[in-house]
């Protein structure tokens, strides 16, 4: 699959949809969780990563449960993410402090935020890079997957990507890639729980 050009995109659903639907890009490779709602807008290929939600908080007040949440505290989330949806549906009494990007949410956490709910990959990485924080809840809600996305109905590209993912799985490519690029970010303890090899996962 020759890639001619990479285009940076903010991690926001509407941007992903727009870029695919207008033909600005043919393929989205991002921290884009597969959901039924999103599958109405795009076609997802086979997954390459497992993901759940997680919650990170300061070491001075590690949040290990969302039960008995202090109603005066706000949970940081990024607008349009599965974290926002999950908390709105399952913990409607938790006030949400919403931001439009990872950078602004990260800044809010670093500047006195009580807790931040996001994909567990994101909060694990944040805590590993910021020693004063702990992932008190490493898995919240159901386990989902992250997968490439193409515009709705682009079966030719979708099939080509799926074939490539299956072929790479036979080489153990995704584990090797994790070890080469992500161990410093997530650590070895999370490798087998995060990596999906050859598109095969029970979370599909």
Give, region by region, the residue ranges found by the protein language model.
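Ligand-binding cleft/hinge of the Venus flytrap
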Residues: 1-6, 82-101, 128-129, 180
